[in-house]
Amino acid sequence: MDTLLHGFVTATARLGLDYRFLLDDYERVPFVQGLGVSIEIIVSTMTASAVAGLLLLLALRGRNRLVCGLARGFIEVTRNTPTLVQLYCAFLVLNMLITQWLHARGIDNPFKPFFWVVLVLSLHKAAFHAEALRAGFDALPSQTLEGAASLGFSRATRFWRIELPLALRAALPALVNNMVELVKASAVASAIAVGDVNYQSIMIWTQRDNVLALMLLILAFFGVLTWLVTLAGSWLERRYRIPGYGY
């Protein structure tokens, strides 16, 4: 491994790129940990945003007008404000208020920056997931819905066994695009000092002034991740496509 690293550092040095930090455990280990943190953020937010998006969809399609209105308002606010601003509001305002309230009672705040990144990104993308699913439901043929109702299925059974599976398949392209955007949006974690790959890279280049070399690594890292998500999404679209829908 050391031989490969030395060879890589030497070869890239001829191109004017400084990757000597890879030979220093003090800098290499945090960088590798940052890669892991970024992946952990992405996996966590993908899972949480999918669950939250489904809950928002249920609220939108529910019979309670108040709940539906609140869900619609949340979606509109979330979709129309920047992710970074939402993260700052959550971490610098809401987190501060929680900290003050807990400290007044002699309790430490258990919510770390990682939690706020996952929460904000998950809720942000959940709004887009819910809209994609809503469009999927709107695209369902009326004959299918009428046929399910005529068979005597309950409303819940129709939703979980017929409508949702078909809507998911119709909404897959939009949902996959949301996941790709989520991978890229995870880069905002460094804004509140979460030790992801961006944050660790900043710590390194402030000492070594090798911004270009590290930026190329970051671009390659996120490029590979988005490619993998796109690849998986394309497979799912082919596997579960609805005949006649054209994708």
Feature annotation, model-predicted:
Residues 1-247:
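Transmembrane alpha-helices and adjacent helix-loop boundaries
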